[in-house]
Amino acid sequence: MRINVDKYLFIGRKKSEFFSACRELGAVEFLAKNKLKDSENVRRISEGLKTLNLLTNKYSPSDLVLVKSGYLTTEQLLQEIFDLNHEITTITDSLKALSKEIFRVKPLGNFSSEEIRELTLKTGLSVRFFYKKHIEGAPLEVEEENVFYLATAYNYDYYVVIGVVSLSKDIFTEIEAPRSVGELREEEEHLQTLLRKKKARVCELYAYREELLEALCEQCNEQTLQHAEASTEDLFDDKVFSALGWVIVDRLTEVEKLCNSLGVYLERVQPDPDEVIPTYLENHGLGALGESLVNIYDTPASTDKDPSLWVFLSFFVFFSMIINDAGYGLIFLATSLFLSFKARKQVKHSLALKRFLKMFMILGGGCVCWGGATTSFFGVSVSYTSPFREYSLTHFLAMKKAEYYLKERPKGYKELVHDYPVLKDKKTPKEFLLAQGTSSGDSVYKAVVYDKFTDNILMEIALLVGVVHLSLGMLRYCRQRYSSIGWVVFMCGAYMYLPIYLQAVSLIHYALHVPYELGGQVGYYVTFIGLGIAVLGGIIQRGLRGLDEVTAVIQVFSDVLSYLRLYALSLAGAMVGNTVMVMSERFSPAVGVLIIIFGHTVNIALSIMGGVIHGLRLNFIEWYHYSFDGGGRLLHPLKRVICQKSQNI
């Protein structure tokens, strides 16, 4: 829920004691003059902590030391971490350069650079190395004196030249080789030994990670306290301070008690006209999960009702409908339970991880329920007479629709009988549903009526969910937007009238027993009544400008139709799952299992992407349009950061 926040003026003497007490209370956000910037100490500690955290990705758990080898101050620890990190980087770069140099001079063989220098000093003869392009079949030896062939490598011929020899620069290229491959390998071995020592030491410093984390928390607390104190205005030769701050209304009593104990005067003041009042949300249970989703897109304004619970429940329904597979839901459920057990220590100290796993578990349960209601399980075709199908929601509604068709004989019934004459003799809903036939271009016999009915039912459920979802949002916001009531009436009337206009049968006819002709006529008039109420509400609220409310009819229609994505995405996932199962049957069991695993893995990934993106989109775009202002900013009260120690790896 959203808790109101009021602006207060504080005047007192004991500035340090007051701000320290407010930090412990965590109910006041002080209006700072400048934006909070991390101090040099905070940046250094954060960088050092980041370096230690990255060790878990570079080294195995057995390499990291968890027992401290001695006492180190924070500054000593940071300096050693930075020095070691710099040295490791430098040595690693040197090893890469050495590796390239070894590769370059390897064809020259082993020689002593010291002996070459002595030879040059004693005789004055230089020793140089050259290479030329290797030509297959050409002689390797060179006719020039004091030019000796060494080796052929990398499609080049290598030579050593003693003394001054005139070689064609068009053919030969000199290669600098101050050290031989053997000398380079000795240096490489030395650097590798040094690198191992440095890495071993930095792994030992991992044991000090908790101390560094505590130091970071302490520095952050001190930094925020100083920043809050800097927001005050000193009066009467710095003997009195004044400060402005936002106070959580539900905790005003605690703030007043604190002020009385320190002799601080507080008075409520009005916010500036252009000032953004911060938003404070406080949720528990499912509402807390919804709050995490709400913060992804935008922050509610201070005038908004908290949409957290609404968003989560809607997302739960949308995600379940898009996944539309009980098998996938079982995988989500099992995975969340396994991770909750496997990472139970981390869950205790990570609120975000705890919320994610809880949400994943609930969504998995929703997918199981909706997949069971639509008889969808890993894309497997369920028999029309299976008990699993007979107790499903789609089967129940299909039976109701078949019963209505046989009783009322609407236009849709006549079209089906014309296309499938075998239906003419069917007297019971079950016989009518399960009658076998072939579709155009298809030679496989199947219950065509059953498939048509279930597809239409799922599509209409998606539209019905859209109407209900938008109506709830409009009613929730009707005090801020008077026309919302009219649009709710308009959508209800349109839902009753459109089946008559399209000469189709709707859920309201065979499930809710709304008379076909009468319901359509009532819906026709209710549609225009709702449109009139919407325009009237707009005029009452905005004057003559409210006449443009009539143009919103297109927006309302398009928003309702946007919910068809629930049906389209679920149908796409079901078709992919079914295709995977059909393909696997054409191969051997071993290959078939691989196809099933790969195909369903890809389908699950795509389904999750669609469920998350479109499940949230229907909330943030369609629903927010009628029930959300947004543009707010979260309240950040001054409070002490409590260091949560992580578990040992």
From Swiss-Prot:
Listed GO MF terms: ATPase binding; proton-transporting ATPase activity, rotational mechanism
S-S bridge residues: none
Residues passing through the membrane, by range: 312-332, 360-380, 455-475, 485-505, 520-540, 556-576, 593-613
Keywords, alphabetical: Cell membrane, Hydrogen ion transport, Ion transport, Membrane, Transmembrane, Transmembrane helix, Transport
Superkingdom, natural source: Bacteria
GO cellular component, one term: plasma membrane
Major site of localization recorded for this protein: membrane
InterPro entries: V-ATPase_116kDa_su
Membrane disposition: Multi-pass membrane protein
GO biological process: vacuolar acidification
Location of the protein in the cell: Cell membrane
Function of the protein: Produces ATP from ADP in the presence of a proton gradient across the membrane.
PANTHER family named in the record: V-TYPE PROTON ATPASE SUBUNIT A, VACUOLAR PROTON ATPASES
Family: Belongs to the V-ATPase 116 kDa subunit family.
Protein name according to UniProt: V-type ATP synthase subunit I
Lineage: Bacteria, Pseudomonadati, Chlamydiota, Chlamydiia, Chlamydiales
Gene name of the encoded protein: atpI
